[in-house]
Each structure stands twice: as structure tokens, then as C-alpha cells.
């Protein structure tokens, strides 16, 4: 019995793994940017930091996955956007620290290599990288029979960015009187899906719920996470923002206080939050308390900016999109976030 046959009998298809690598090369090529060194398939991805032109570079890194949103991608057999979610979750955290994302690596684990499906996943990763301006410089695809079912897979990513030391955003610049500006989310993004799946467990995904304005439920649930790099980076370069919050798991209540020091409070005007239809549907069909929605979901705001009043107009000028003035920073109240 040859070694190849022995491995195949264990459930690992080496040839399928080679096919995956060949299929994804064209997608990886789309993401190339200045600073990339080496070629796909080496033992390590390489990047020349001197190409960024940053004088006092500070590296900022982030890693994340997409949680149980993957289970809906598998359920609905749609795999070409979930990779964008993975990239977004990493690079949005990096931009919140005032850094420009540079490169990304992905990790896919599956019970059985399906080259067509995995190419779809990586195509979404590449699309996310293009939107974020980062290079996909490496990754790993692990076939793990016995660990995962044949149709199952998990996806995680890792990103690295660079910031000028003087432009780092760590919450220390946010002050009383700052205006809170919200940038719209594209949907649920990639958090809260254990609850989402419970609420819609008995739905096929093809439903046209009245709250969803003519869209099929599955399309709304799998809407990819918005990537905010292109919107936020010019603001960082001009030093127009004092704080940035990526509104992910834990919603407003957990993420907004991460923007500023403990002696401040964010006062949010709920009427100015652009709540998306899917959140109204979740609250209704899931019988979720209204205040709890803000503890779980982004509610329509995926990125929040703390901006000095004198810079608000310039920020709006640079952002070619609706910008929502949803609150302000005040002296410390009983809670770190007050929604009124």
C-alpha cells in the first residue's frame, strides 16, 4: 500500500489540496500591493515595511473569524461572500487603532477538501482584501476528517497594519464635548448569529418578510460585513478623529466605551440611529427586549467616530456617504453608555 493511498484512506485528499492552491492563485494575484515580497506557497509571507513610507512605524495586528454566520453560508450553500466577512472583522479593528491594514492571512479548516467551494471562499477573502487595500500574502487550508463533517468548514484570518506613532488612536484623545458620528453598517455584519439562527431556525431563507423591503431573508442574513478602511483612512491621515469604535459583538454597550477613558460617557440619541430593517425584524420575530438589541447588535452603525466639533464639517466633506450625528461625549454618568 503506497503512502498516498494510506493517507487517502484516512480521509485526506492530497490531490484536492493541490487543486485548491491552483484555483486560488488568480484570486491572490488580485490583492498584490506595494511591499509584497516572495510568492504564494512559501513557508512564510513577506512584506517590506519600508515601502509604506511611515517614519515612526507601529505595527497593529488583529485576528478574528465570522462565528456561526458560517453555518448559514453552509445551510444556504453560498460561500463567495463569507471571506469578505472574515477580512472585515480583522481590518476594521486595525483601522480603529489608527493603522492602515497592510496584509492578511487566512486559515480554512474543513472535513473534506472541496476545491470548488474553497475557491469560492477564497474569492470572497480576496474581494475583502481588495476593498481594504491589503495583500493576501499567505494562508492555510487544513483537511481534518473526523474533526469536521464533510460539508463543514471554519474560517479565520489575521491582519497586520501600520500606523505613525503620533497618529495611533488609543482613546486618550477623546474628550468631553466630542461629537459621535456613525457610519452605516451593511447589515448584521458578523456578530450575534447564534441568536439570529435561533430566531429564524424554522425559516427556509426564501421568505420575503414585510420588514425586509422585498429582499429574501437569506440574502439579508448573509449580506457581507462592510469594510471601513477607505472611508476612515483619510480621516486618520488628516488627524480629524479622536476615537474610533468598531461596533461588533456586544453592540453599542460593550464597544462604544472602548473608544474613550473611564471618566467619560457616550450619550446616544436613539432617534438618530439609522436602524436597519433586519434589526426591527429580529426584535419582532425573536421577541427580544428593545434595550437588549443595543447590547447585541450594531443596529445600523458599524463604525463610530468621536470628532471635535470644529472638525465635524470636514469629516462629513471627506466622507462621500450619509453621516449620522448620533450623540456626544459627556462627563462620566452612572453608565459608560447612555441611550436616550
Curated annotation (Swiss-Prot):
GO biological process assignments: 'de novo' IMP biosynthetic process; adenine biosynthetic process
A single Gene Ontology CC term: cytosol
Molecular function in Gene Ontology: ATP binding; phosphoribosylamine-glycine ligase activity; phosphoribosylformylglycinamidine cyclo-ligase activity
Keywords, ordered alphabetically: ATP-binding, Cytoplasm, Ligase, Nucleotide-binding, Purine biosynthesis
Catalytic activity: 2-formamido-N(1)-(5-O-phospho-beta-D-ribosyl)acetamidine + ATP = 5-amino-1-(5-phospho-beta-D-ribosyl)imidazole + ADP + phosphate + H(+)
Major subcellular site: cytoplasm
This protein's record includes keyword Cytoplasm: yes
Top-level taxon of the source organism: Bacteria
EC number(s) given by UniProt: 6.3.3.1
Assigned protein family: Belongs to the AIR synthase family.
HAMAP family (alphabetical): AIRS
Name this protein carries in UniProt: Phosphoribosylformylglycinamidine cyclo-ligase
Gene name linked to the record: purM
Amino acid at each position: 500500500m503506497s503512502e498516498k493511498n494510506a493517507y487517502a484512506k484516512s480521509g485526506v485528499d492530497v490531490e484536492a489540496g493541490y487543486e485548491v492552491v491552483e484555483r486560488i492563485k488568480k484570486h491572490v494575484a488580485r490583492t498584490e500591493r506595494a511591499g509584497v515580497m516572495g510568492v504564494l506557497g512559501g513557508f512564510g509571507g513577506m512584506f517590506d515595511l519600508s515601502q509604506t513610507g511611515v517614519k515612526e512605524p507601529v505595527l497593529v495586528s488583529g485576528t478574528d473569524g465570522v462565528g456561526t454566520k458560517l453555518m448559514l453560508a453552509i445551510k444556504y450553500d453560498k460561500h463567495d461572500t463569507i471571506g469578505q466577512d472574515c477580512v472585515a472583522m480583522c481590518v476594521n479593528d486595525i483601522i480603529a487603532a489608527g493603522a492602515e491594514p497592510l496584509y492578511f492571512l487566512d486559515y480554512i479548516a474543513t472535513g473534506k477538501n472541496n476545491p470548488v467551494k474553497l475557491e469560492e471562499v477564497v474569492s470572497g477573502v480576496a474581494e475583502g482584501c481588495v476593498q481594504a487595500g491589503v495583500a493576501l500574502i499567505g494562508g492555510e487550508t487544513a483537511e481534518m476528517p473526523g474533526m469536521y463533517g464533510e460539508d463543514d468548514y471554519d474560517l479565520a484570518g489575521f491582519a497586520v497594519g501600520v500606523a505613525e506613532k503620533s497618529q495611533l488612536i488609543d482613546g486618550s484623545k477623546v474628550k468631553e464635548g466630542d461629537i459621535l458620528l456613525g457610519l452605516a453598517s451593511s447589515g448584521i455584519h458578523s456578530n450575534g448569529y447564534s441568536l439570529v439562527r435561533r430566531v429564524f431556525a424554522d425559516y427556509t431563507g426564501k421568505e420575503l418578510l414585510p420588514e425586509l423591503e422585498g429582499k429574501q431573508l437569506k440574502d439579508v442574513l448573509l449580506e457581507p460585513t462592510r469594510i471601513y478602511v477607505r472611508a476612515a483612512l483619510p480621516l486618520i491621515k488628516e488627524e480629524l478623529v479622536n476615537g474610533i469604535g468598531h461596533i461588533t459583538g456586544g453592540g453599542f454597550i460593550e464597544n462604544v466605551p472602548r473608544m474613550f477613558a473611564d471618566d467619560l460617557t457616550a450619550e446616544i440619541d436613539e432617534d438618530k440611529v439609522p436602524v436597519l430593517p433586519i434589526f426591527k425584524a429580529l426584535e419582532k420575530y425573536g421577541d427580544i427586549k428593545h434595550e437588549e438589541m443595543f447590547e447585541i447588535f450594531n443596529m445600523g452603525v458599524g463604525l463610530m467616530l468621536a470628532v471635535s466639533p470644529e472638525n465635524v464639517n470636514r469629516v462629513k466633506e471627506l466622507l462621500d456617504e450619509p453621516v449620522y450625528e448620533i450623540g456626544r461625549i459627556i462627563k462620566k454618568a452612572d453608565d459608560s453608555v447612555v441611550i436616550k
